[in-house]
Regions:
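Gly/Ser/Thr-rich loops at beta-strand to alpha-helix junctions
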Residues: 1, 112-115, 135-136
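A cross-family glycoside hydrolase active-site/sugar-binding cleft signature
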Residues: 1, 59-61, 107-109, 131
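Glycine/Thr-rich beta-alpha phosphate-binding loop at enzyme active sites
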Residues: 2-102, 137-152
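A structural signal for short secondary-structure junctions
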Residues: 52, 99-102, 112-113, 120-126
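Glycine-rich beta-to-alpha transition loops that act as phosphate-gripper elements at the mouths
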Residues: 64, 104-117
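Short glycine/threonine-rich loop-to-helix capping motif typified by GTGT followed
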Residues: 70-74, 117-123
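Glycine-rich phosphate-binding active-site loops on the catalytic face of alpha/beta enzymes
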Residues: 119-146, 173-175
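Extended, intrinsically disordered, low-complexity segments
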Residues: 141-176
Length: 176
């Protein structure tokens, strides 16, 4: 979940990327699983899976709750996805990849689209799913391009994430 990054990181990233209008408090950051608790838990799950002859990985990421301020939808919260979510999701992936030396298998759905699917897969993250891009007007026209870009990638062994390549992708996403 993007909340693993901490409130300060996420607020700064959103502000720096021009999403300063997105309103959220630190509530979900305090209420959700903390990074310091997530890493040991994931290690235990990987160890248990290995003992059973199985593998364990993570799917990144969920949507990110933001406050409804202009009556965009009924209720109090809506959930960020798509382009705005990508820098957060790829940053979570990078941080986890570093903590696990690239040995934690990951799948991805946080803002993948025709512009970045090949970069995500080239980092050793797969499968990758897309949704938000398809919901936009004309979104289905991107399916062929997305499929072609994904198909051009060499898929490595599951659980071999390219830590440095992913770190650069995450850093670049915070300035694009």
């Amino acid at each position: 979940n993007p909340t693993l990054l901490g409130y300060e990181f996420v607020r700064k990233a959103m502000d720096d990327l021009g999403y300063d209008y997105m309103a959220f408090t630190d509530f979900h950051f305090k209420d959700d699983l903390q990074y310091e608790g997530a890493v040991p838990m994931l290690k235990r799950l990987m160890e248990t899976a290995a003992q059973e002859g199985l593998s364990f990985g993570v799917k990144l990421t969920n949507t990110f709750p933001v406050d409804i301020k202009r009556q965009e939808l009924p209720g109090e919260e809506m959930y960020m996805s798509g382009k705005a979510l990508f820098p957060l999701s790829i940053s979570v992936a990078s941080r986890l990849a570093e903590s696990f030396d690239g040995k934690l298998p990951m799948s991805f759905s946080g803002g993948a689209d025709q512009k970045n699917i090949d970069q995500i897969v080239d980092c050793g993250i797969w499968p990758v799913t897309v949704a938000t891009v398809l919901l936009k007007p004309g979104g289905y026209k991107w399916m062929t391009k997305i499929a072609e870009k994904a198909d051009s990638c060499e898929i490595g062994k599951c659980g071999e994430v390219q830590v440095e390549t992913l770190k650069k992708l995450a850093e670049d996403s915070l300035t694009d």
